[in-house]
Amino acid sequence: MALIVNIEKTLGDFHLKVNFTAEREVMALLGASGCGKSMTLGCIAGIVRPDKGHIELNGRVLFDSEKKIDLPPQKRKVGCLFQQYALFPHMTVEQNIRAGAHARPKNEREQAVREVLHAFRLEGLENNRPSQLSGGQQQRCALARILVGQPELVLLDEPFSALDAYLKWQVELELSDILKNFSCGTLFVTHNRDEVYRLCDTVCVLNKGKSDPKETVKNLFRAPATMGAALISGCKNVSAAEVKQDGTLFCKDWNVTLKTALNVPENTAYVGIRAHYFTTDGAENAIPCTVERVVENPFSTVVMLQTTGAGRLRWELDKAVWETLSGTEKLTLYVRPEDVMPLTE
């Protein structure tokens, strides 16, 4: 599977400008609410028309503004799974799935329906209506309806957002198994970084309508390239920074100079440090702090610290470790050079 997306769309004051490619993988579009994730999916599916650009799937042009190509949704071979699954409430499980098989030759449809009923563990539920299914069964039915039509690409738009925490975990595990067993590519839209880490191979971060370069999920969490990517991946500590001649980074908000073991781009403007990267013993990158506030979580402690600059730091650590330091007002934190992340705009 090869997907090429290079489009722009303006809606009021919002301007979408995304450019990425995807192979046969589970790729996330990760970003905050309102950043353009769902609009991007709509453009790929043919529900939203871009103002200009090009969309191509497996060598077939789905949209090209210059060539005036704009295939209707039913001809794009793209399947969409939305937040509420959009099952037909008056139809049974089998009827819902059969509705997705209309693009296949008539002599293949019955066999295809039987195969996906088995593959999605829906046998015995064929005559049930959606209201009689659990959340996980509804999702399996919706995915079966999509995949019985043999799409070349599946779009998942926040598929867990309407579920409570316990059901969400169960449904996520089921979806993970399903995605491993089907060979079409998948675009997964979410604002939840944990879902991305568990389910996806690669990720493209969207920030205020603009896409960052695609990267592996592991690299996003280990060394995000931009401030937007760092924040959406959960980095709690970001300071404006200046690159010094010796390659160190002066962190303006924290009033400290830090060494980094990572590559420092010329246009580095910020430094990020994850909340769990700090220690109280080390040889490099000392940061003098004053304890300002302590917040107890069920299984960890969050310590808010004032630096010698105008900015604060957030440190998250094991409760037992904090108990050995409790009552301390002045602390010097240390961070390894490999944990200091240079960030561009």
Q: Locations of the language-model features?
A:
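Conserved ABC transporter NBD signature motif
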Residues: G53-S65
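ABC ATPase nucleotide-binding domain helices that frame the ATP-binding cleft
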Residues: S38-L41, C141
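Non-catalytic connector elements of ABC transporters
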Residues: V5-A32, S38-M39, G46-R49, R60-V61, ...
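The short alpha-helix immediately C-terminal to the Walker A/P-loop
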Residues: G42-C43, T202
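Catalytic "switch" loops of ABC-type ATPases
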Residues: I47, V78, F82-F88, N192
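A position-specific signal in ABC ATPase nucleotide-binding domains
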Residues: V48-R49, E56, A86, H102
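ABC ATPase nucleotide-binding domains
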Residues: K77, T92-G228
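C-terminal boundary and immediately downstream tail of ABC-type ATPase nucleotide-binding domains
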Residues: F221-K244, G272
